A protein has these predicted regions:
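PLP-dependent aminotransferase-like
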Residues: 104-161
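Active-site pre-lysine segment of PLP-dependent enzymes
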Residues: 145-155, 167-190, 194-227
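Conserved PLP-binding catalytic core of the aspartate aminotransferase-like
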Residues: 282, 292-326
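PLP-dependent aminotransferase class I/II
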Residues: 69, 217-301
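N-terminal "arm"/small-domain region of PLP-dependent enzymes with the aminotransferase-like
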Residues: 1-64
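Short acidic capping loops at alpha-helix termini that bridge into adjacent secondary structure
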Residues: 34, 84-88, 108-111, 155, ...
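Phosphate-binding glycine-rich loop
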Residues: 63-111
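PLP-dependent enzyme catalytic core of the Aspartate aminotransferase-like
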Residues: 322-326, 331, 335-369
Length: 369
């Protein structure tokens, strides 16, 4: 019996999501230590102290189920961003929410629009529900919003937009998004995936929650894995109009957010100093990456995220493999249709130094531009 024959039709064409290589795996494979992982856009400052203290206070209560509605976390999010608790949906990471949006608003033969070179989970969730994927060719490695509008049809149910985009780091301004949303029919749900929004400079950051007042079909999705440092706990949230939030919470699994994730998220919601420290390091070190690439004539895509994508003008897999032997893990993105690129997470200064040294050795970079 081949069980693929009884699987959902959409599942048959899927391949499992390939995460960045874990440090422990490379240690086992090559027997090396002092490895630097710059592959998964994780927080280089580690787990925030505010969350550690909150977890310690929660440990004696783990025999109880978590708060299924996440009342205290919703209250903290609402207070921080000036929204209402009934606008909020909590997820087991923002990936959980992306799947939830697809299950709630699209079905078999409905159309889902997203960009070429956008987050790979968008096509995964689209195919899993047997919906029709409409991948719009990228414009300068980012979203072609006019192309999105042209692709709209009576069958379009859902649009995914990552801002900043992963894995390219492209960024859409608030004016661009506002003009786009004004042209999208209200019956089409637009998901604005802001997993990396904290890394944008405050002066240019999109006030996405204000857009919710103008566009009732908008959902803003955010993650606590990146700037907030809670990747291992899996927690994210979405903000939408209350009617959409109600529908999402009908589909959302009960207890999808565990107690430690909830209590940690509540703590970091008020830990502005930690998030600013992370963002400032990212801005400073991003400039070093850009200067390095310019110095050695390496093309890169300007990024507003906590990563930079470099175009090596040749298949990048051998470069990736050699970097592994130097104890540096980065992210190959051939699965995104970008076989000549590698995505590098912005780390601490010493981690970035190790990458620069390793890449110069791997590419034999001697002649500065």
């Amino acid at each position: 019996m081949q069980y693929i024959n009884v699987a959902n039709q959409g599942v048959k064409s899927l391949s499992p999501y390939q995460a960045g290589k874990p440090i422990e795996e490379l240690e086992r494979e090559l027997g090396i230590t002092n490895i630097v992982k710059l592959a998964s856009n994780e927080n280089p400052f580690g787990f925030p102290e505010s969350a550690k203290k909150a977890i310690q206070a929660q440990l004696d209560h783990l025999t109880r189920y978590p708060d299924a509605n996440g009342f205290e976390l919703k209250a903290a999010i609402a207070k921080k961003f000036g929204v209402q608790p009934n606008q909020i949906t909590l997820g087991n990471g923002s990936n959980d929410l992306l799947e939830l949006f697809a299950h709630t608003f699209a079905g078999e033969h409905d159309e889902v629009i997203y960009s070429q070179y956008a987050f790979i989970v968008y096509p995964l969730v689209t195919k899993a529900i047997n919906a029709v994927a409409k991948e719009i060719p990228a414009k300068d490695w980012g979203h072609d919003l006019n192309g999105f509008l042209t692709a709209l049809s009576d069958k379009t149910k859902l649009i995914f937009i990552a801002n900043p985009n992963n894995p390219t780091g492209n960024f859409l301004t608030e004016a661009e998004l506002d003009a786009f949303l004004a042209k999208v029919p209200e019956k089409v749900i637009v998901v604005l995936d802001e997993a990396y929004t904290e890394f944008t400079h405050p002066s240019e950051r999109v006030n996405s929650f204000a857009l919710l007042d103008k566009y009732p079909n908008l959902i803003v999705s955010r993650s606590l894995s990146k700037a907030y440092g809670l990747a291992g706990l899996r927690i994210g949230y979405a903000v939408s109009n209350p009617e959409i939030a109600d529908l999402l919470n009908r589909v959302r699994q009960p207890f999808n957010c565990n107690s430690l994730a909830l209590t940690s998220a509540i703590a970091v919601m008020s830990d502005d100093a930690f998030v600013e420290k992370v963002a400032e390091n990212n801005r400073r070190e991003m400039k070093r990456y850009e200067a390095f690439c310019q110095q050695y004539g390496l093309d890169f895509i300007p990024s507003k995220g906590n990563f930079i994508t470099i175009d090596f003008k040749q298949p990048a897999a051998p470069i990736y493999d050699t970097l592994l032997r130097e104890g540096v893990i980065v992210r190959p993105i051939a699965g995104y249709g970008m076989p000549n690129h590698l995505r590098i997470s912005i780390g601490l200064p010493q981690e970035n130094d190790k990458f620069f040294t390793a890449l110069k050795k791997v590419l034999n970079l001697r002649n500065e531009k």
